[in-house]
Amino acid sequence: MSKFYKVLLASVLLMPSVVYAAEEGKETEREAASLTANIKRIAVQYNQNSVTNKEEDAEYPGTYTSDEQSVFTGIFDGNLEYNNATLVWLNSLFMEYGHSETQQNGEKTKSENADKILLTTDYTHKIWKLEEGIVGPFVNLGYQTEFTKFKADDGKKYRTKIVRGKAGMKLYEGKYFKELYAAAVEEADYTYGAANMKTAGEIGYQFEYQIRDDMKFVSDGFFRKYFIYDKYRNTDFKFEAETNNRLDVAIVGGLSFAPFVNYKVAKTRGAKKRRSDTTVGLSLGYQTDYKFF
């Protein structure tokens, strides 16, 4: 295990004691503390995707090889949030899946347009309270996998298995930018068996703008650039970027209707050209929260 992961794992394991220490002896902060279960989004969306340079390079994994068809996709995005005057601790789960099936000459072909499971725990320490939001260091540890296996260029099937650690600085709880961060990233990729260690840099954001009472623009995204690899694998990304944008229109309660446009682009080590995937569609979603205290 690299020094980065030892430090990151120690930070994550110490989170409960840090939370307790922050609470101990601070009655006013304890009263202001909250524990909330956030269902950020449960949605079913109908979408059409378009992949560029699909026929020119084979060295791309997963949904970058999907067919250009209309499909239904299911999404779940939720977290458990502990928040007080000095820290924010999030434990999150994100899942999405969508696929299409076609039959030609008696042969059925399946194409995945979305397949992702992401578990993360994230600790942010609040240091500076600015007009634009709260700024402080953060650590994040996550595990990314998928529901079904994909077929690689060697003819075998594999399932994405990535442990990803991040450490950096974050702007949190801003008026528009709910999250804006820059971080160093260390990955342990177990997709093809033995760990393939990778080092990268990443910037990302979450943005919200309330257009009117019943309408809100929501956007999130990231850019990740890899610098160091432990092994060579032609499907390893050199860089990866993604932005997801939707216009939430409230219907009733937590139910909303949203047109959306998502775009992701990447280039692998074995490809000559970068490949992009654009998805447009409509979604029906639900969001709510429950405060324990």
Where are these regions (language model features)?
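Short loop/turn motifs that connect adjacent beta-strands in outer-membrane beta-barrel proteins
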Residues: E24-T36, E81-L90, K126-G136, Y172-L180, ...
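Transmembrane beta-strands of outer-membrane beta-barrel proteins
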Residues: A33-V44, W89-L93, L119, G133-L141, ...
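Transmembrane beta-strands of outer-membrane beta-barrel pores
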Residues: R41-T52, N84, M95-E101, L141-K149, ...
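Surface-exposed strand-loop-strand hairpins of Gram-negative outer-membrane beta-barrel proteins
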Residues: N47-T73, Q103-T109
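Residues on the lipid-exposed face of transmembrane beta-strands in outer-membrane beta-barrel proteins
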Residues: G74-Y82, L119-H125, Y143, G165-E173, ...
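Outer-membrane pore/translocation modules
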Residues: E101-E202
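Outer-membrane beta-barrel transmembrane domain signature
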Residues: F177-A250
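Predominantly the C-terminal beta-signal and adjacent terminal strand-loop region
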Residues: D236-F293
